[in-house]
Design a protein with these regions (language model features):
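C-terminal-of-GTPase-core extension/linker across diverse P-loop GTPases
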Residues: 1-20, 28-41, 45, 49-56, ...
């Protein structure tokens, strides 16, 4: 079995894309350590080369520690993230709901990420996952004008004023975008 990454060039809705399919990272009891180390290095390289990463979770197993580690790596490398849960064709609605709850519970820190249920076997929702990954990349690269950010801050302060600090209300003056992928903002007070 090859453990190398496969690069596939294709066009989707007038966009040139490269899909990097990496070998799955498996549980320790099921692995040949040398081959697995090679696979992990290739997966890390693929994350570094990517604008957007789709983490494919096996719906029969649920989210594993390896999945959580990979998601952490994607976020640490500041890449857009989409999660796909495979085996939609083999799971009952009840099982899918339980997996969704498990994912939302274990990934509270990434509640902004799209989670899509798919079937690699029947190809169900595959284009939905691709669209989610492209949208996530587009959003992560977006820049917002300072005036819009400042207006948003003003509206937020008006509807829900900041707390007092040492008897004085915290004042938020303006904000600007400090970077993208991921978008970062600096608020001045």
């Amino acid at each position: 079995t090859t453990r190398d990454s496969i690069y596939v060039d294709f066009k989707y809705k007038q966009r040139e894309l490269v899909l990097i399919d990496t070998a799955g990272i498996r549980r320790r009891k099921n692995i040949d350590l040398d081959i697995e180390k090679f696979s992990i290095v290739k997966a890390l390289q693929a994350v570094e080369l990517s604008d957007s990463v789709i983490v494919l979770i096996d719906g029969m197993e649920g989210i594993t520690d390896q999945d959580l580690s990979l998601i952490g790596l994607v976020l640490k490398n500041e890449r857009a993230l989409t999660i796909a849960v495979n085996k939609l064709d083999a799971l009952t609605e009840y099982q899918m709901e339980n997996i969704d709850k498990q994912i939302r519970r274990k990934l509270k820190f990434v509640n902004f990420v799209d989670v899509n249920n798919v079937s690699a076997l029947t190809k169900e929702n595959i284009t939905l996952v691709l669209k989610s990954a492209i949208d996530a990349a587009d959003v992560s690269l977006k820049t917002v004008p300072t005036s819009k950010i400042t207006k948003l801050i003003e509206d937020m302060v008006e509807s829900d004023p900041p707390p007092y600090n040492q008897g004085r209300r915290i004042k938020l003056k303006y904000a600007h975008q400090a970077g993208s992928q991921p978008p970062m903002f600096i608020i001045y007070g």
